Regions:
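Acyltransferase
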Residues: 80-146
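Pocket-forming structural segment of enzyme catalytic cores
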Residues: 2-85
Length: 146
C-alpha cells in the first residue's frame, strides 16, 4: 500500500487491459468508475508479480481490477457499488468536519456541488457484478441435483 498525498475522490475513466477475461465481458473499451481513498496499491509490485493479471487500469486513478488464481481472487480498487449520492455525502461530511476535501472529479455538473451528481458508472457496475456472479461464483460452485 502506498499513501497518497491527498484523497483520490471522483469518477475516473478506465481502460480494459485484457478483453479475453470473462469478468470484463461486455465492458466498453473505456468505462467510468468511482474512487474514494487515501492509499493505492503499488503499481510496480502488481506488474512484477507473475501471479497477478491487470484487467483494467486508469491513467488518473491507477490499477482498477486485478485477478489472481484464475479468478479465485479478484481485487477491485474502486467503488463500483457506490450509488449516485455516496461521494456527495462523503464530500459534504468532510466539509462539515473542516477537512477541506478536494472536490470529487468528473462528478458534479460544472464542478458545482450544489447540483445533482452525474451517474456515469451504473452500467459498468451492473456488468461487473453480473459477470463475477455468473462466471466466478455460479459456474465454479459445485452442486448436485437430486
Amino acid at each position: 500500500k502506498v499513501q497518497l498525498e491527498k484523497k483520490l475522490s471522483g469518477i475516473y475513466r478506465h481502460h480494459v487491459m485484457n478483453k479475453k477475461e470473462p469478468l470484463v465481458r461486455g465492458f466498453d473499451d473505456f468505462f467510468m468508475a468511482p474512487h474514494s481513498r487515501y492509499t493505492e496499491a503499488c503499481r510496480e509490485d502488481i506488474l512484477n508479480n507473475p501471479k497477478l493479471k491487470v484487467l483494467a487500469d486508469s491513467k488518473e486513478a491507477g490499477i482498477y481490477i486485478v485477478m489472481a488464481q484464475e479468478g479465485k481472487q479478484i481485487f477491485v480498487m474502486g467503488h463500483p457499488e457506490y450509488d449516485r449520492m455516496t461521494l456527495d455525502q462523503e464530500y459534504k461530511r468532510d466539509v462539515k468536519k473542516g477537512i477541506m476535501p478536494t472536490l470529487p472529479v468528473h462528478y458534479y455538473p460544472d464542478d458545482d456541488p450544489t447540483q445533482r451528481p452525474i451517474l456515469s458508472w451504473r452500467s459498468h457496475a451492473n456488468n461487473l457484478y453480473t459477470n463475477w456472479l455468473n462466471y466466478y461464483v455460479y459456474q465454479s460452485t459445485p452442486y448436485e441435483w437430486h
